[in-house]
Amino acid sequence: MIFVIESKLLQIYRNRNRNINFYTTMDNIMSAEYYLSLYAKYNSKNLDVFRNMLQAIEPSGNNYHILHAYCGIKGLDERFVEELLHRGYSPNETDDDGNYPLHIASKINNNRIVAMLLTHGADPNACDKHNKTPLYYLSGTDDEVIERINLLVQYGAKINNSVDEEGCGPLLACTDPSERVFKKIMSIGFEARIVDKFGKNHIHRHLMSDNPKASTISWMMKLGISPSKPDHDGNTPLHIVCSKTVKNVDIIDLLLPSTDVNKQNKFGDSPLTLLIKTLSPAHLINKLLSTSNVITDQTVNICIFYDRDDVLEIINDKGKQYDSTDFKMAVEVGSIRCVKYLLDNDIICEDAMYYAVLSEYETMVDYLLFNHFSVDFVVNGHTCMSECVRLNNPVILSKLMLHNPTSETMYLTMKAIEKDRLDKSIIIPFIAYFVLMHPDFCKNRRYFTSYKRFVTDYVHEGVSYEVFDDYF
């Protein structure tokens, strides 16, 4: 295949030297560049063969981007690039992706090609489509990266005068640097105490990398980078590490002394609440709690919402007292574990059943019924049964009716349903059965009158109501 490509290029070269019109010549040049671009894809390349091929080539400005293609070959002998540069290919033209040859060579860590391009006039301050100069691309070993930094700076790379799309300079964009590289970049004049357009400093950004390390953060702190600075959303580095699914305890230990664990971001989250929300182990949460003199109500509420009875116990051991409001919230959010913990510690809310009904947590209703919570509590004129009607929930209604509400409760239930003009259809059978099982109900004029009106207002007008004539 290489022989075929070489033959094609030789034929194009011969045709170019004959008496051929301009358009045919341009077609030949474009064809030659096409075959040269194919040659770039072969693993085995011969410099002499390459030089022969170049005899048929003149830079055409077409979309083959020959110089870019060869600069992107790992381990390529820089003499191939040198031949292209001597042939007239410009090191300061972009390909279709907005990359310069110098950016491409920097990305693949080919310092010899970087040096070759720079000596032939490549602009070390040119920006790609991400607004990054070659200094942003610092892959490779420490020695290779430092060598490339020296090359770029030697040929005029400017310091601290460029930012990429995220508002980062080259130093800030390097999210996982080695200590040697970081110090080298700083030694040539880069400013360490800077932030990106989101207000994140080097520690923030390192924590967002794939493999953040406590050792890296430690020497960043020694270089004067703040471990407690909040970004524009109010997140400190500790917020970030606490929000991750996998927690790095060494990093948490490193950041804890300098950060208030109750400091809230603009979304109302603190490092402590983020640990709770991400279902972190209790011992890790205890580590943060041990640094705080104040345990906020928000922390307790988050524990309840996420059903963390284990954390409630830790908080209680630190002196935090719970009350009926906490029990009520646990019922409302369906936190069975927290309800059980509070109940075991004699913390209750007498009208808990009412709020369990409002939340429509059947399991919570069952748990409260099992623990003998009353179905007779009335809140603002509404009963547990009237709220079942409002919610159109016959399942919970049937559970409550099986636990013997009082006659007064049923009277108030009917009053609430009529007052709010609720649909009576789901409760009529339950009330009828209740009256049947509680004959004393109809011996009370107030109860009986209300019941008669409640039923007759619902049943069709043509129905006889003589069944009620025996009373009063």
Curated annotation (Swiss-Prot):
Record-given protein name: Inhibitor of Apoptosis OPG037
Top-level taxon of the source organism: Viruses
Subunit composition and interactions: May interact with host caspase-9-Apaf-1 complex.
Subcellular location as annotated: Host cytoplasm
SMART domains found in the cross-reference section: ANK (SM00248)
GO cellular component: host cell cytoplasm
Biological function: Inhibits host apoptosis. Acts by associating with host apoptosome.
Induction: Expressed in the early phase of the viral replicative cycle.
The gene coding this protein: OPG037
Family: Belongs to the orthopoxvirus OPG037 protein family.
SUPFAM superfamilies: Ankyrin repeat (SSF48403)
Keyword annotations of the record: ANK repeat, Early protein, Host cytoplasm, Host-virus interaction, Modulation of host cell apoptosis by virus, Repeat
Gene Ontology biological process terms from the UniProt entry: symbiont-mediated perturbation of host apoptosis
UniProt keyword annotation of Isomerase present: no
InterPro entries documented for this protein: Ankyrin_rpt, Ankyrin_rpt-contain_sf
Keyword Repeat on entry: yes
